[in-house]
Amino acid sequence: MSANRFGHRVVEGAIRNISSDSNVNAEIKAEYYSATGTLIGTEVDIVRRLGPGKTGAFEVVYSGEQRWDIKYYKIVNLQEI
């Protein structure tokens, strides 16, 4: 997890389409937590039109007021949409 130039918390990564389906759309959901384990917020990113065997980058951004309290995150869902 990093912070962008606005101080928003950013989770970056990549996913790969391991199926033979073309133009797969995927949703990545991340939950952001405080040091005490309190859920601060949930955000999503969508990777669109991912062809067979192709890799796509994602960036899940939390820009809420409590962004400075975030200490860790969990990717809680990765699904085709």
Where are these regions (language model features)?
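Transition segment at domain starts
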Residues: 1-8, 62
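Asparagine-centered strand-capping/turn motif at beta-strand->loop junctions
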Residues: 15-20
